[in-house]
Amino acid sequence: MPKRSEYRQGTPNWVDLQTTDQSAAKKFYTSLFGWGYDDNPVPGGGGVYSMATLNGEAVAAIAPMPPGAPEGMPPIWNTYIAVDDVDAVVDKVVPGGGQVMMPAFDIGDAGRMSFITDPTGAAVGLWQANRHIGATLVNETGTLIWNELLTDKPDLALAFYEAVVGLTHSSMEIAAGQNYRVLKAGDAEVGGCMEPPMPGVPNHWHVYFAVDDADATAAKAAAAGGQVIAEPADIPSVGRFAVLSDPQGAIFSVLKPAPQQ
């Protein structure tokens, strides 16, 4: 279902980048994914929110760092989860062990949002759609294809997401003593969860974009001033992926999906 007109509660439906150099970041992602941009003024004089588009569809956004951000705060790709009633979900966050970073507020007529952290410290946005449903094109080259919660306490985190947004999960062993949890909104598989692959990685929601060639995209990212954090590698039955960073230091992954059987 590449084109989307709605999202079930619990489904990651949007990603945006907060960066220290918005202009440079836009050029980098255009070189990688072919994105264009629609710039929308941020209320309160906070610059512009650059809506990334592909084939006329909204696929992501690139924004400046938020006002009052701590000095040295690294650029980051944020994940947002669709909710039916953001205020009702926010009311469950603190009792569930999380924290409310930004109380619910309206973004004009686009929607209503909040930003929270789960009990393991991973930050995530909550989005109640109005005019803006989130990404209207996914799972195609240059668009969002997967969102993955990396946390050192997966059981604690997943109990929280089940309580606040109704996400369930199934589990599979991917290596000796290492499980991968597939997140589900109803019967649909909408994301993943695993422990960080290396020491020192903070708990966070990680973003994957679809590409035609993971190796070529990694090389292109490096040539454009980014870095290859993890060299391209195969995931059996899933595809070939690489972990990259943009020139400002925001980390993301690219995935060439395996052919569908």
Swiss-Prot record:
Gene from which this protein is expressed: cfp32
Ranges where the VOC domain occurs: 11-129, 143-257
Assigned GO CC terms: extracellular region; plasma membrane
Name by which UniProt lists this protein: Putative glyoxylase CFP32
InterPro entries noted in UniProt: Anthracycline_SecMetBiosynth, Glyas_Bleomycin-R_OHBP_Dase, Glyas_Fos-R_dOase_dom, VOC
Database matches in SUPFAM superfamilies: Glyoxalase/Bleomycin resistance protein/Dihydroxybiphenyl dioxygenase
Keyword Secreted found: yes
Note: Overexpression confers resistance to pyrimidine-imidazoles (PIs) compounds.
Organism: Mycobacterium tuberculosis (strain ATCC 25618 / H37Rv)
Function: May function as a glyoxylase involved in the methylglyoxal detoxification pathway. Induces maturation of dendritic cells in a TLR2-dependent manner, causing increased expression of cell-surface molecules (CD80, CD86, MHC class I and II) and pro-inflammatory cytokines (TNF-alpha, IL-6, IL-1 beta and IL-12p70). Acts via both the NF-kappa-B and MAPK signaling pathways. Induces Th1-polarized immune responses.
Record text on subunit structure and interactions: Monomer in solution. Interacts with human TLR2.
Residue span of region Glyoxalase 2: 149-252
Keyword list, A-Z: Repeat, Secreted, Virulence
Protein's cellular compartments: Secreted
Induction description: Expressed in tuberculosis patients.
Region (Glyoxalase 1): 13-123
Keyword Nuclease: no
